[in-house]
Amino acid sequence: MAQKFKVMKRVSATCSELPDQVFAELIEELGFPALVDGYEDFDGAGASGPTIEISTGQMEKLTMTLKMLGNHSDLYAVFRKKAVWTFTGVVEDEVTGEKVPHEVTATCRLGGITPEAKNRTGLHKHDYELKSIMAADIVEDGKELFGWAWGESPRFAGVNIEAEDDAILGLV
């Protein structure tokens, strides 16, 4: 089987609070949610040997970042509002040329707007932070890579990795 070399080429963004706008060619950077499992150090309470990490069973908070060229004054009206943001990218396999969609959807708040300093010759940019993410889905070519909503267990590659725990706790 040939190795794949997939690269995201282009991306667009939409916000449910601004239904008539699509942000596309102005996106310079997009920071997708980092999936980080929570761990705590355990030193063995005096036992010899190295400190070990124990999974807490909790993921770290999800955040996203966005850097766009220009001044988007309409986004100030969305600041602190709960909205559904959708980011759609074109992922191309550099080996085969096959293109597939990559979509990230997050129910969250626009929690940060940081204008960069404007210099005389460069383009003005703004950094945006999406915070208080209460639901997130990452889907590539119709396949769920990650899915989660507040009060639900996370799914990785479409599988609830906490299904056994949920059953023991009577959550299913």
Predicted segments with their positions:
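Short, acidic/charged, Gly/Pro-enriched secondary-structure junctions
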Residues: 70, 76-104
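Mixed-charge, glycine-accented linear interaction segment located at domain edges/termini
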Residues: 108-172
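Catalytic micro-motifs at enzyme active sites that drive phosphoryl/nucleotidyl and oxygen chemistry
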Residues: 52, 75, 94, 113-120
